[in-house]
Amino acid sequence: AALGHELHVVTSLPWYREHAIESGWGGRLWRVEKTAWGSITRVHPFPGKTKRNLLRRALGFVLFSAVVGLRSLVAGGLPRRVDGVLAMSPPLTLGLTGWFTKLFRSGMLVFNIQDIFPDAAAQTGAITNKQILRAARWLERASYERSDTVVLLSEDLKQNVAAKLSTKFHDRLHVIPNFVDTSAIVPGDRMTSYRRELGIDDRVIVMYAGNVGFSQSLELVLAAARSMPHIAFVINGDGAARKSLQDEVNAADIDNVYFADYQPIERLSEVLSSGDIHVVPLKTGLASVSVPSKMYSILSAGRPVVAAIDAGTEIPRTLAE
């Protein structure tokens, strides 16, 4: 947009933090907002009541991707060709949505992969049905092969995808790591308003901030909290594993673990500054399917990172540098 290009974004209505459509955004299947540089179309994401119902989530992804595809045909007005289409995964279903848009509106298709599915779901045990996995793997390969460019976050992810494709597709794979706005996330004083809101004094805080899923191995945080009762451990975020972690904390009467909801993006710098040490855990074997990009935000905030991730992969290599 800064170069004068016209952009049309088709995305979801705000829902991720609460796993429900945020107040003031409900009541419509989509909303269109005109901007100085183009337009934003926000589509209903069809969220279920819980992230643990995988069949319901899959249905939501399919419905969302279908509506996104239809709205992408008219974003910016008809009949208009476009120069490029950018689709992002997850959800994986947006790969074919991008291809569908390209068929009708021309332009190159760039498929940006944040996590590799269905590998991530299969390796965490979230999906075990062989028929579902077979269908998802077909969708994955079909999406890669129909893209002009596939962008991945690390060499580890690139090698994973390359192993699934014929060599004639390998020149389409490119690595572009995630990044942060270092002017928005800056080092700050550790004694923040956020710390006071949590009811934590000047104790050392070990923090995990991000998605609280089953791939993060956050049981490590609870184990550390048991052995270091003088340190406060903060889990900031939400996800499918949060309830089970809270149940474990309550059952074991661990009183130095604090759970907090996602905070507004404007508070990210303050939240990260509240932590003295940040942990970035990932289950063994998952570094080839996912890159915890929260590391970049933590480093921008000037805080140390303790990573529990497969040795020799993207995050350990970056920290070693």
Functional labels for PLM-detected ranges:
Residues A1-A36:
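N-terminal subdomain of nucleotide-sugar transferases
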Residues L13, D156, I176-F179:
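Carbohydrate-associated surface elements
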Residues R57-L73, V82-G107, F111-Q114, D119:
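An aromatic- and histidine-rich active-site surface loop
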Residues H5, A162, F179-R196, S217:
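Acidic anion/phosphate-binding donor-loop and adjacent secondary structure
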Residues Q216, V257, D261-S273, H278-L299, ...:
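Nucleotide-sugar-dependent
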Residues L73, R81, T93-L96, F100-F104, ...:
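Membrane-proximal helix-turn-helix segments that form the acceptor-binding/catalytic region
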Residues D201, M228-G237, R242-S269:
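Nucleotide-activated donor-binding/catalytic signature segment of Leloir-type glycosyltransferases, i.e.
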Residues V180, I200-Q216, L222-R226, V234:
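Conserved donor-binding/catalytic core segment of Leloir-type glycosyltransferases
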